[in-house]
Amino acid sequence: MPAKKRTRKTVKKTVSFSDDTTLTTHQNREKKNVDHDRPPVYVRKTPLMTFPYHLVALLYYYVFVSSNFNTVKLLSFLIPTQVAYLVLQFNKCTVYGNKIIKINYSLTIICLGVTFLLSFPTMLLTILFGAPLMDLLWETWLLSLHFAFLAYPAVYSVFNCDFKVGLWKKYFIFIVVGGWISCVVIPLDWDRDWQNWPIPIVVGGYLGALVGYTIGAYI
């Protein structure tokens, strides 16, 4: 009988370099340190808590109560109510790492000044999008102030969360998109007072902010 051939098992050879192992371990430690130093930031999915009830009241006042759509007076109501919304609602839903950040009252005041300054680049962008420059410059700046202070809670959160801009930019986008969509009613030949610049854009910005702060946590 022919002798059976023995099959030899192939042994996989592995080579380990201590320098590579040390480098991998060091990179893993660095990643853990980065995660510890820059914990994740998110807004809790609590629409009843993040819903900006005050914007509904302000819109109702502006459209149905105020005389001649007083944009200046509306702004004087917007600023304090946005601060109250940040302190009482929005900040309590913002989680940094594993904890809710306590409100920084000095930072709220600083961010009021920052938001005011943001109205100037906002005005420039509004003009680039086609806003009137010479004839209605005051109205255009008022619109920019409204847009800037509608984003005030997001501006504060950028400063209070180590400048994590990516999370908060969606709130700016909602405001801009709301104002941009509302432009369609201006050229219509209806001859209504509410078609005058910048009334429709103000209303659109408020509606955009209303939607953004309500569903922003889900996006």
Swiss-Prot record:
Coiled-coil stretches noted in the UniProt entry, renumbered to this chain: none
Look up and give the organism this protein is from: Saccharomyces cerevisiae (strain ATCC 204508 / S288c) (Baker's yeast)
- Name of this chain's protein: Glycosylphosphatidylinositol anchor biosynthesis protein 11
Residue ranges in the Lumenal topological domain are 67, 130-135, 192-198
| Bilayer topology | Multi-pass membrane protein
Q: Where in the cell is it found?
A: Endoplasmic reticulum membrane
Q: Phosphoserine: which positions carry it?
A: 16
Keywords annotated in UniProt: Endoplasmic reticulum, GPI-anchor biosynthesis, Membrane, Phosphoprotein, Transmembrane, Transmembrane helix
What the record says about family reads: Belongs to the PIGF family.
Per the record, ranges on the Cytoplasmic side are: 1-45, 89-108, 157-170, 218-219
Known function? Acts in the GPI biosynthetic pathway between GlcNAc-PI synthesis and GPI transfer to protein. Required for the formation of complete GPI precursors CP1 and CP2.
- Which spans are transmembrane here? 46-66, 68-88, 109-129, 136-156, 171-191, 199-217
> Pathway it acts in?
Glycolipid biosynthesis; glycosylphosphatidylinositol-anchor biosynthesis
Q: Which domain of life is it from?
A: Eukaryota
Q: Which GO terms describe its cellular component?
A: endoplasmic reticulum; endoplasmic reticulum membrane
- GO biological process per UniProt: GPI anchor biosynthetic process
InterPro entries in the record: GPI_biosynthesis_protein_Pig-F
What one GO molecular function would you report for this record? mannose-ethanolamine phosphotransferase activity
The record's listing under Pfam families reads:
PIG-F
